[in-house]
C-alpha cells in the first residue's frame, strides 16, 4: 500500500470512527427500551467501513461501542453495540472475497438479510449473557429478547445497510 492509499485509508477510518462515536451522542431519532435501542443510522458508519476493509470495520465497531458508552446508554446496550464485531468482521471478510455482492440487487438483499440474522443472533446472545450474569430469569424475557432485540435488530440492520449502501455508492461514483 503506497503512502497516498495509507493516508486515504487512515482518513476514511478516522471520519467513520468520528461518525460512529457521534451518532449515539447526537442522533435525535432514537427509541430506547432496554435492552432494545433503535438509533437511526447507528450502523451506517459500520456498514461503510465493512464495505471497505475488515480492519476498518473492526476499528469503527470498537469506536461505536465507546460512543454508546459515552452517551450513557445502559451497559447491556453497549454490549450489544460491541457484539457488532461478529457481523461486521464476517461481512467485511465476505465482501473482500465477493465485492460484486454490493452491485447485484439480489445478492445484496440476501447478504443483507443473512448479515441481519448474524447481527441479531449476536445481540440476543450478548443480552442473554448479560442477563444470565445478573441473575435475571430469562424465561420471562422471550418477548424482549427475540421480538424487540432479535426481530427489531434484523429490521434496523437491514434499513441501515441500505442507507449505508446508498451513501457508499454515491461516494464511489464521485471518486
Question: Residue spans of the language-model regions?
Answer:
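Loop-helix junctions at membrane interfaces
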Residues: 1-175
Amino acid at each position: 500500500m503506497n503512502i497516498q492509499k495509507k493516508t486515504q485509508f487512515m482518513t476514511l477510518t478516522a471520519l467513520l470512527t468520528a461518525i460512529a462515536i457521534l451518532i449515539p451522542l447526537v442522533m435525535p431519532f432514537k427509541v430506547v427500551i432496554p435492552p432494545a435501542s433503535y438509533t437511526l443510522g447507528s450502523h451506517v458508519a459500520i456498514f461503510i467501513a465493512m464495505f471497505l476493509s475488515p480492519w476498518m470495520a473492526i476499528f469503527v465497531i470498537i469506536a461505536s461501542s465507546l460512543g454508546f458508552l459515552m452517551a450513557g446508554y445502559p451497559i447491556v446496550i453497549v454490549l450489544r453495540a460491541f457484539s457488532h464485531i461478529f457481523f461486521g468482521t464476517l461481512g467485511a471478510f465476505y465482501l473482500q472475497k465477493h465485492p460484486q455482492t454490493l452491485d447485484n440487487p439480489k445478492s445484496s438483499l440476501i447478504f443483507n438479510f443473512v448479515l441481519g440474522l448474524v447481527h441479531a443472533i449476536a445481540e440476543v446472545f450478548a443480552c442473554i449473557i448479560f442477563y444470565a450474569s445478573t441473575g435475571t430469569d430469562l424465561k420471562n424475557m422471550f418477548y424482549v429478547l427475540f421480538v424487540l432485540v432479535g426481530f427489531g435488530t434484523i429490521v434496523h440492520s437491514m434499513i441501515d445497510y441500505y442507507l449505508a449502501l446508498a451513501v457508499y455508492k454515491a461516494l464511489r461514483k464521485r471518486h
